[in-house]
Amino acid sequence: MYRVGIGFDAHPLEANKKGLYLGGVKVSEEYSSIGHSDGDALIHAIVDAILGATNAGNIGIWFPENEENRGRRSTEFLEIIRKKILAGKYEILNIDSVIIIDKVRMNPHIENIRLKLARILGISKGNINVKPKSGNTLYGNSVSVYAVCMLKKVGT
C-alpha cells in the first residue's frame, strides 16, 4: 500500500547572527527564522508530510510549543519520527519540497541539504528533491516550505 502526505510550514525572518537552518543545514549567517524551536521550516514541512501520510497527526501534536521544545533542533524531530513512525513500518519512496525564500540564495546549499536529510532518514539522496524559489519578492521577510512524501507500507 502506498501513502502520500503533504506538509507546509512558514516562518518570518529576522536579521541577526544566529543563522538560518533549512534541512538541518545552516544556509545564512545574516538571517534566522522566528520560531519556537530552531525554525527549520523545511524539516517541519517534511515531518508534517510524513505524519500526514501515516495518519499520525501533525508536528504540533508530536512536538508542542513547550519548554522541552524551545530552541530544539528540528533534526531531532525528524529522527524521532523516523524511529517511532517509519522504522520497520514504512519505506520512504520520495520526498519533494519547495522552499520559497527571497532573502537567501538556496542553490549553493541544495546538495548539502539533500545529503543531510538522507542521512537522518536513512535513505538515498536520490529519493529527496529540494526546489528553491525566490517568490519574486512576494514573500519578503519570510520562508515558506511545501513538502510531499510518498511512502510504501512495508510488507504489502
UniProtKB/Swiss-Prot annotation:
Alphabetized GO MF terms: 2-C-methyl-D-erythritol 2,4-cyclodiphosphate synthase activity; metal ion binding
Cofactor info, note text: Binds 1 divalent metal cation per subunit.
Keyword Heme listed: no
One GO term of the biological process aspect: isopentenyl diphosphate biosynthetic process, methylerythritol 4-phosphate pathway
Positions bound to a divalent metal cation: 9, 11, 44
Site for Transition state stabilizer, residues: 36, 134
Keywords: Isoprene biosynthesis, Lyase, Metal-binding
Pathway assigned to this chain's UniProt record: Isoprenoid biosynthesis; isopentenyl diphosphate biosynthesis via DXP pathway; isopentenyl diphosphate from 1-deoxy-D-xylulose 5-phosphate: step 4/6
Binding site residues for 4-CDP-2-C-methyl-D-erythritol 2-phosphate: 9-11, 36-37, 58-60
Cofactor or coenzyme needed: a divalent metal cation
EC numbers on record: 4.6.1.12
Family matches, as PROSITE patterns: ISPF
Name of the featured protein: 2-C-methyl-D-erythritol 2,4-cyclodiphosphate synthase
Subunit and partners: Homotrimer.
Gene designation per UniProt: ispF
Catalytic activity: 4-CDP-2-C-methyl-D-erythritol 2-phosphate = 2-C-methyl-D-erythritol 2,4-cyclic diphosphate + CMP
Function: Involved in the biosynthesis of isopentenyl diphosphate (IPP) and dimethylallyl diphosphate (DMAPP), two major building blocks of isoprenoid compounds. Catalyzes the conversion of 4-diphosphocytidyl-2-C-methyl-D-erythritol 2-phosphate (CDP-ME2P) to 2-C-methyl-D-erythritol 2,4-cyclodiphosphate (ME-CPP) with a corresponding release of cytidine 5-monophosphate (CMP).
PANTHER family in the record: 2-C-METHYL-D-ERYTHRITOL 2,4-CYCLODIPHOSPHATE SYNTHASE, CHLOROPLASTIC (PTHR43181:SF1)
Lineage, highest ranks first: Bacteria, Thermotogati, Thermotogota, Thermotogae, Kosmotogales
Catalytic EC class: lyase
